[in-house]
Amino acid sequence: MKKSYFKWGAISKRQAKVLTWWKKGSRYASYNGIIADGAIRSGKTVSMAFSFVLWAMTTYDHNNFGMCGKTIASLRRNVLGTLKNQLRARGYTATERRADNLLVVTKGNRVNMFYIFGGKDESSQDLIQGITLAGVLFDEVALMPESFVNQATARCSVEGAKLWFNCNPSSVTHWFYQGWVLKCGKRKLLYLHFTMEDNLTLSEETKARYRSQYSGVFYRRYILGLWCVAEGLIYLQFAEDEQRYMIPQAEVPKLSYIEIGADVGGNKSNHAYVAAGYTAERDVMYVLKAWSYKATGVTVTQYRENLIKFADGIREQYGFVDTIWPDCAEAAIVNELDAHSPYNIRGSIKEEILDRVRCADILFSQDRIKIVEDECEDLCAGFRTAVWDDKHDDKPLDDGTYDRDVIDAFDYSMTPHITQLVRG
């Protein structure tokens, strides 16, 4: 048996309830499941996953269970590594068969199978059809499509099966909030709301660091743990104090990476280019230059010539350009640049738009974005006026009332390094 390196610290009352609600004698033992939502770093996942397997191993033998994440990779990263150590520390054998996406847990003569699923899109429901389950754990259920969750819950036909949900909050109109959180009583589900105070292993310094990472809707969701609507200005911190982020060109340090994001607008919008630089550490984003101009009447050749001229100016000023990232949806533009440009051309990395906004929010919150003054007015104008769409959940308004194209170009210059930027 592999040696376990997991050691439990002090646990909060909510974590203790997660670990015991299903046990004989508990007032909740007859409930159909549990929902644990709330803030990031609040101790939900570590207690939910362990309790799920502990319940399964205590209650069943030779049965199948489901463990679901947004992707299989994210579930392995966020749940399985710690979970296997937790189980080994309690005398269980936990063997992962990666080729089968299966975790086999045994203790004595008792064995159960935990199948791993990813629920990233509507087609994911097909992956879970046909199997009979005695219970399912949904890690970050708010990131999954309703069809996948409905299919997974329908697989739980074994007597006494229970459903386990955890997530960070999203919009109040989200299907999970409307259909499960608000109806937890009717569905006979235990509902627990977590904050960072429920994670007794976090120091005050660590909690303060997490609080400093977010503002606006992300602060309300990830720090306060509230289900809420994204509304108003998207880049509120910039709009309230833009001088806080401006620097003269002379203060740009030696850069190790320079990326140019290039958006392609329609006839009634703009073409836009944004150049961003990063030091070797990639902990600060330096916005070097931005240019946005009307797209009407601009040919593919003219677009290419304008972009090369923009890139030439950056190379002359800073010595190099790593990559130009044109909108990957515009194949004609990408092909034109690839065939007739002296620069390295790659289609843009289109992260989920909410993840892009969240990264920018972290950078603004922690003063880790610096904008070269007098070179980025088009982008600054976009930051000042960008708002959420009040008719579509978690979507920026894109009706031409502000320059969305220059912000998309900004995003494309950021996403090649988004993982390092979020980590700080």
Where are these regions (language model features)?
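Conserved P-loop
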Residues: Y31-N101
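Pre-P-loop entry segment of helicase/translocase ATPase cores
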Residues: M1-G33
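ASCE P-loop NTPase helicase motor core
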Residues: G135, L143-Q213
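Short beta-strand scaffold segments in enzyme catalytic cores
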Residues: N270-G277
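Catalytic acidic motif of RecA-like/P-loop NTPases
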Residues: A73, A142-L143
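Inter-Walker segment of RecA-like/P-loop motor cores
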Residues: R76-L133
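ATPase catalytic-site recognition across NTP-hydrolyzing enzymes
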Residues: N199-G265
